[in-house]
Amino acid sequence: MNKPILHKKTFQELTTDELYELLRVRSEVFVVEQNCVYQDLDGDDQNSIHLWLTLGNRIVALARVCPVGTHMKEVSIGRVITTVRGKGYGKQIMIHSIETAIKHFGATHIDIEAQEYAKGFYENRIQTVVR
């Protein structure tokens, strides 16, 4: 099986097509699949670093990393999505997101925004990543 390709860009570096595809996937998963009705376009994307994994032309996971004081008090990771489950892409995107939070924003503490049902996923993964 092919290994997914990591993409990492600031909002300003995103092409129009990339931005559209990221927002389309977020809407498809959060609004349509999970029935989470909230304002996805919250004004924080412009200051964030966007990460996504692709296999071919398909996004299999994505996340955004927000600097201190943008979305939460601390550096934060949110809008985490996997479109293909059971392949470890969620863990991969979280590892890359944590590395990005530390490298680009100097994070020593990271807030993770998650829906209630997903908190166990993050708690289990974070302990294996951050020691």
Language-model segments: residues:
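Conserved GNAT acetyl-CoA-binding A-motif
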Residues: 101-115
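A conserved beta-turn-beta hairpin within the catalytic core of GNAT-like acetyltransferases
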Residues: 67-77, 85, 104-108
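Conserved beta-strand in the GNAT
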Residues: 52, 58-67, 74-81
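Short amphipathic alpha-helix that is part of the acyltransferase structural core
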Residues: 1-47, 55-58
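Residue-level recognition of the GNAT/N-acetyltransferase active site
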Residues: 81-85, 113-115
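Conserved active-site alpha-helix within GNAT-family acetyltransferase domains
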Residues: 109, 116-131
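Conserved acetyl-CoA pyrophosphate-binding loop and the N-cap/start of the following alpha-helix
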Residues: 84-97
